[in-house]
């Protein structure tokens, strides 16, 4: 079985932008396209919650890694809920970068507690975002891929106690 990264030249990364303006989405897309990744892009113009769930394509769900860019400027409370939702939806394979034009230390701390891996200032500086992507690429490249189904659990239930099913 061949590794999909070797066959296609790079790992499959889902790039999700949440409530970001067009200029930010364009900047993020252009910089991420320079990485050696196969990008699966999704742009959402609303925050996520339990009541308002997004639709992710199957390719985005099956991607080896996910990168979410969440803009905190419009509604920080809903942005925090979105970060928590993404963290639980893509458990252990997502990196979340928060963006805000206001450098509020309390907001940065709350976003990190909710699941953000990094927090950058708006307007997005290409050099800072490239450094973040390079760190993530190094991290994701060092993780050894495991098969999805590594084992099987078989359990037996006896009809009544004392029949030797242990």
In which residue ranges do the predicted regions lie?
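Conserved acidic segment of CheY-like receiver
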Residues: 9-32, 49, 69
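Conserved phosphotransfer microenvironments
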Residues: 52-56, 60, 64-86
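A short, hydrophobic beta-strand element within the central beta-sheet of small alpha/beta folds
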Residues: 93-103
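Alpha4-beta5-alpha5 "output face"
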Residues: 109-113
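C-terminal output helix
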Residues: 124-132
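The C-terminal output helix
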Residues: 135-146
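Walker A (P-loop) phosphate-binding motif
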Residues: 145-166
């Amino acid at each position: 079985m061949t590794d999909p990264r070797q066959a296609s030249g790079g790992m499959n990364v889902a790039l999700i932008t949440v409530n970001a303006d067009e200029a930010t989405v364009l900047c993020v897309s252009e910089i991420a396209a320079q990485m050696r990744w196969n990008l699966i892009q999704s742009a959402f113009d609303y925050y996520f919650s339990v009541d308002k769930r997004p639709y992710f394509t199957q390719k985005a769900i099956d991607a080896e890694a996910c990168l979410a860019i969440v803009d905190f400027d419009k509604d920080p409370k809903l942005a925090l809920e979105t970060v928590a939702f993404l963290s639980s939806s893509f458990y252990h394979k997502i990196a979340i970068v928060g963006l805000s034009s206001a450098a509020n230390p309390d907001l940065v701390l709350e976003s990190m507690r909710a699941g953000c891996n990094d927090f950058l200032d708006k307007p997005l500086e290409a050099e800072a975002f490239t450094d973040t992507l390079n760190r993530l690429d190094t991290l994701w490249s060092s993780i050894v891929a495991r098969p999805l189904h590594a084992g099987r659990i078989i359990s037996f239930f006896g009809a009544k106690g004392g029949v030797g099913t242990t």
